[in-house]
Amino acid sequence: VPFAKLGKKQRHQISLVPQDFAFYPLLTVWENLKFFASLYDVRDKGYLLELLAKVDLTSHKNKLAKHLSGGLKRRLNFAIGLINRPIVIFLDEITVGIDPQSRQFILDSVAALKEQGVTVIYTSHYLQEIEQLCDKLVLLNEGNLIYQGSVQGILEEEQSLERFYLDFLNQAGNTC
């Protein structure tokens, strides 16, 4: 079913955290959360405060978003994606360009979402993250599907996803 044909309730159960920041840099962290909450008709201030704590931004609540570090901006982007309590969330390159501590924080948060039963669709070029987080995998090369199946299936035959992908590229005559 095309997204546009879903009802409002179904659309509000799906969330996207894009690679590019999707917040307003001239608003504070708190103002951004309140604005995006209003789009989903979320009025529970307590929930927004919990969300701030969940992404470890409580102490940055009153900072302008543009003054946050890259890792904190990723956390704000992630928090905005969680405002609507999605049952399906698309995470596009969510750990690109951030420090190791923020990266691990986000990976742990994504793992917690999975444990809560949220369906996570995770795009990444970091194959180690995929090994760590994902059950199923779709690999694309230049827009073409090259693998669809379980991560475990690849790991049983190969040493790593990197080895699988590099072997595929070599067989196809591509080089890195």
Role assignments for model-derived ranges:
Residues 89-92:
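Catalytic Walker B motif of ABC-type/P-loop ATPase nucleotide-binding domains
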Residues 34, 38, 43-60:
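Conserved ABC ATPase "signature" region
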Residues 64-71:
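Conserved ABC ATPase signature
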Residues 148-149:
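ABC ATPase "signature
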